[in-house]
């Protein structure tokens, strides 16, 4: 009888717990400086654009573009925010905000938060992700990892 109750308990637990899976996105792109406000020799505000491509571990790929602002004080990037648009097949879109604080900038690690998404991928909305980024001249490579429900792209 104990086994029967254990099986029933496990069934209900598995029914109510949403399974989580890793959603990994790799982004490649080119950075272009649009405008700089140079306040002093060590302080400035830069506006950048990014155009590139992405692919994920679910077989999706597409184009991405970003609007970025970067605040530098005493030659140290104090704040960096990137507003990103991901364009999938069939006019599916996702938008996220990538942030990095001054502590995160040295390590090249930050956070993504998906803010707006098409209905086809609605489970991605409000997903928080960790990303890392590497630069080479005006190009970059970013990889993010998100924990999302298994139904997010089904």
Would you name each region that the model predicts?
Residues 4-13:
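Sec-dependent N-terminal signal peptides
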Residues 19-154:
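Beta-strand-enriched cores of mature, soluble protein domains
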């Amino acid at each position: 009888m104990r086994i029967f109750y254990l099986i029933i308990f496990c069934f209900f637990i598995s029914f109510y717990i949403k399974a989580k899976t890793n959603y990994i996105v790799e982004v490649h792109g080119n950075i272009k400086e649009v405008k700089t406000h140079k306040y002093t020799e060590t302080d400035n505000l830069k506006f950048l654009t990014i155009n590139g491509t992405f692919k994920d571990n679910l077989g999706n790929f597409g184009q991405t573009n970003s609007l970025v602002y970067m605040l530098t004080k005493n030659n140290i990037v104090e704040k960096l925010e990137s507003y990103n648009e991901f364009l999938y097949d069939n006019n599916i879109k996702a938008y996220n905000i990538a942030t990095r604080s001054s502590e995160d900038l040295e390590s090249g690690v930050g956070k993504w938060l998906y803010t707006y998404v098409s209905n086809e991928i609605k489970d991605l909305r409000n997903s928080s992700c960790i990303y890392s980024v590497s630069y080479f001249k005006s190009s970059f490579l970013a990889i993010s990892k998100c924990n999302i429900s298994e139904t997010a792209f089904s």
